[in-house]
Regions:
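Domain-level signature for soluble enzymes in the chorismate/prephenate branch of the shikimate pathway
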Residues: 1-281
């Protein structure tokens, strides 16, 4: 049985990892904060951790990416996408016109901006640590004038009612998750393989980023993402996080990475792993 660290029971992460691990024997260990989720695996208390890393609407979850870069030294073992369905949750007798406060995670609030503007513009929006925490606070308070944005699973667990289903602004909203841990995930295979790397450019080397991209371009290696993040060492110093549509088994990719190191770049491979779409899992 594999032990997997994840954000609280009823969160989108909880729904997403259940989807990925269908058919496998696993135990979920819940933590309130993403830092604790990651550290449990880094410390050996769990085999894997689940990290939400990107969303169709909001883009990169930079804080999670930074934590993986600076505070963990474990490889990515899989990625998958999952559609987060956000709902308005409260008590059966809640009157939307009387709602005073909406509680949820900042990403969930952002994903439902248009609905909240049209239906609850009068209510205060309070950001909490997770969608589940918002649901818990509404349940604890017992006030019908408080509502939360969260999953059906969270509403069921905490005995609340879904007042409005699927209130997200975009139908094609997807969240990308990473499974991070020391060992390869057995029992799941995908034809689609990816590699993630971190590059630090050499100082005083004009055109270094162009050289890096050229190493991939002339080999016809596709990059699906490139993002700069601060190194935290000096103002203006950045890492480049790059997702590559290829496996480390590829001779072409290994050649590209050697070329990049030859121009003086520091290189760290964050993982070479299977990538699953929603229907493939």
């Amino acid at each position: 049985v594999i032990k997997v660290a994840v954000l609280p029971q009823g969160s989108v992460s909880d729904e997403a990892v259940r989807h990925l691990l269908r058919g496998l024997e696993y135990e979920l260990v819940y933590y309130k904060l993403i830092t604790d989720v990651c550290l449990s695996t880094a410390n050996g208390d769990t085999d894997y951790c689940v990290v939400p890393i990107e969303n169709t609407i909001e883009g990169s979850v930079s804080a999670h990416l930074d934590f993986m870069i600076h505070d963990m030294d474990l490889p990515i073992q899989a990625e998958w996408v999952f559609p987060p369905t956000q709902n308005l949750i409260g008590f059966p007798d809640t009157d939307l016109a009387a709602v005073e406060k909406v509680l949820s995670h900042q990403v969930a609030i952002a994903q439902c901006r248009e609905y909240l503007k049209a239906n609850l513009s009068h209510a205060e929006k309070e950001v909490v640590s997770s969608t589940v925490e918002g649901v818990k606070q509404v349940q604890r308070e017992g006030n019908p004038n408080w509502v939360a944005v969260g999953t059906q699973l969270a509403a069921d667990i905490h005995g609340l009612t879904v007042l409005a289903k699927d209130i997200g602004d975009h139908e094609n909203n997807m969240t990308r998750f990473l499974l991070v841990g020391p060992k390869e995930l057995n029992g799941k295979r995908s034809e689609h393989l990816k590699t993630s790397i971190l590059i630090t450019l050499p100082e005083d080397y004009p055109g270094a980023l162009h050289q890096v991209l050229s190493a991939f371009a002339w080999r016809r290696i596709n990059l699906s993402r490139i993002e700069s993040r601060p190194t935290r060492k000096q103002l203006g110093n950045y890492y480049f996080y790059i997702d590559i549509e290829d496996s480390m088994d590829s001779v072409l990719l290994r050649g590209a990475l050697k070329e990049i190191e030859a121009i003086g770049c520091e290189l760290r491979v964050l993982g070479s792993y299977p990538s699953f779409n929603y229907s493939e899992v």
